[in-house]
Amino acid sequence: ALMKGLDYVFAAQYPNGGWPQNYPVERGYHEAITLNDDAMIHVLEVLHDLAEGDNHFAFADDALKQRAQAAFDQGIACIAAMQVQIDGQRTVWCAQHHPLTLEPVKARAKEPPSLSGGESANLVKFLMRSGPTTAEVVTIIDSALKWFDAHRLTGLRKTKNDQGKTDYIADPASTEVLWARFYDLQTAKPI
């Protein structure tokens, strides 16, 4: 069963290194390379652990480890290629990217093509933890961290409303640092 699952992961990977939200590929946003819900990160974590010979994968022979490493490396290359550049500067990522052009794309109605705070933060954490320590990956991480520093939101406090949902209220005394879920691709302002 585990080998069937791994074969599924290998088969689902696009030639550019990304993975669709669903496989076999369906039309619409399901075909997009999906960072939303950490989908691609979870796949890359499994491949990384397999390639590194993690105890959970003690059964893996060298050929399977090499196959996992190759898929992992393709995934990292895809992450590098998807990092949105604005005026020649690397920024962060969208929650979903087009499977061929790698451009940011819309998913569900509430998920516009945009720069994404949450998915990008988790992607940077993943790269810092498990990414190869190449000059390119260091540049990717540094660029994203600079973008986060320049786009943090201050003067707000996170609270719960009467229905138990999260609200944000203006509070100049707040020491919380927050980021928006989505930022406009042209203005980099919160949406």
Where are the regions that the model predicts?
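Carbohydrate-binding/catalytic loop surfaces
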Residues: 21-38, 89-114, 160-191
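Structural helix-adjacent loops and short alpha-helical linkers that scaffold large soluble proteins
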Residues: 1-3, 51-73, 130-142
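Extracytoplasmic/periplasmic, Sec-exported soluble proteins
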Residues: 31, 35, 39, 64-71, ...
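Long, repeat-rich segments with strong aromatic
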Residues: 91-152, 159
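Well-ordered alpha-helical segments within folded domains of soluble proteins
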Residues: 1, 36-51, 115-129
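Long, well-ordered core segments of solenoidal/helical folds
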Residues: 2-19, 69-88, 140-157
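Alpha-helix capping at helix-to-loop junctions
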Residues: 11, 15, 49-52, 56
